Amino acid sequence: MFHASWCGWCHKLDSSLNHESIKDIFDKNYVTTHLTVYESKNKKEFENPGALEFLTRYKGNDIGIPYWIILDKNGKWLADSQIRPEGADYNHVGENVGCPASREEVNHFLKVLGKTSTLNGTELMAIEKKFLLKK
């Protein structure tokens, strides 16, 4: 997950992923790594070296943060936080959902999770409930 210390949506995504109702689900299915980018001038030392280049490589450098990608165990791209038109390939820049909150964004998130894990219906429903919760 690409993030910055000043990014409110980044903190919200982190809090949601670590919420007691779904943390174990994510921990069993994903390894979450934080890469810090776009820090303010007085916090540039907190940026991870090479993170911006990595973000650019995966087409996320101009569409906002948080931005997340899912790679397989060999580092092959599987999915990311961009909603693209049906049938569009990875090279088509879409709309970044960042921290999913709207119905469309949460649906995209659930679709990605369903394709990149072995999550069952109950687990996906718990994630949906947490992300659609307005608190």
Predicted regions and their residues:
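Thioredoxin-like thiol-disulfide oxidoreductase module
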Residues: 21-22, 27-112, 116
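Conserved redox-active cysteine motifs that mediate thiol-disulfide chemistry
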Residues: 2-17
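Generic hydrophobic, helix-prone segments enriched in Leu/Val/Ile
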Residues: 13, 55, 62, 124-128
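C-terminal partner/receptor-binding element of secreted or periplasmic proteins
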Residues: 106-135
